[in-house]
Amino acid sequence: NAKPEEVARIKSEALAMRGLALFDLTRLFGMPYTLDNGASLGVPIEIQTTLEDHAPERNTVAQCYEQVLKDLNDALGGLTKEKHDAYMNYWSVKALLSRVYLYMNDNENALKCAEEVINDNGGIYRLFTHDEYPSVWGKDFNSESLFEFYFTMSEPSGGSGGEGAPMVYADNVKDWNNLILTKAYLDLLNEDPEDVRHVFPHLPENAVADTLPVAAKGQPKYLIKYPGKSGSVTDAVSTVNPQDNDLCILRLSEVYLNAAEAAFKIGNTEKALTYLNAIVTRANPAKSVTSADLSLERILKERRKELVGEGHAFFDYMRNGKSV
């Protein structure tokens, strides 16, 4: 008895999720599209129900990206432009398309999709302000969240179970000291002592246990970007529980940085600076990037600072042919 528009929405959400899954599998198990225009092997494309003895073969990266684009574009027609927390909507798919096109070096389309999200969403999404920045990270469906996986402690698994992004929170008082911030990242952040993102790195609370790695002793090496629904990044690390922190997959700040990179690559310095400085100046209102300072390296640096702990840096450097 479902209404046709409801069936269309559910199908579109499934297509969007399939596109997201295939994209993530391809970038993880395949070479970057930009290496050889997708000629190398990616992952099998499986879009039909098969018998258990089916032996899938790998498709090329280009074929995988073609299917990703088809799924995402086919999804758009059945999705709402209204905010739909914990579900894919029109804007989250457009944001994902900006990411996919950027990975393909299709910068015209990457910029087009990113700008549509930024300029046409009707105010249902907006960047955090400088003052809001320290207090938003545990909240459900904040103003930048285009799509996130929802977790609650009432689930049998106990929220996220501490897996995924919340595990980036890793204080050695709980014996999770295998995930720490690198010196390279801390050096980037320390270039500006007034950067609001200094709220994320924390010193170990247990001085006795602060022994490994030796080179990082006494450094603020733990990332508390996921403090849980009742926590704050300014709380003591040992007092917060990240297990019920939602996992944000698509965030508006990334879309701005996608737009900045795409605009730079097609030679539109004005737009590149506009979108980049929205992030730079938010982090420190006294700072901005000038045309003389604008470069791909500067944009990637800002991506690394802003999107730390969100799973982007490795792929950003790989797709741009940079050393990791």
Per-region residue spans from a language model:
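Acidic/polar-rich alpha-helix caps and helix-coil junctions
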Residues: N1-A165, W176, D187-V324
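Short, cationic low-complexity segments
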Residues: V168-Y185
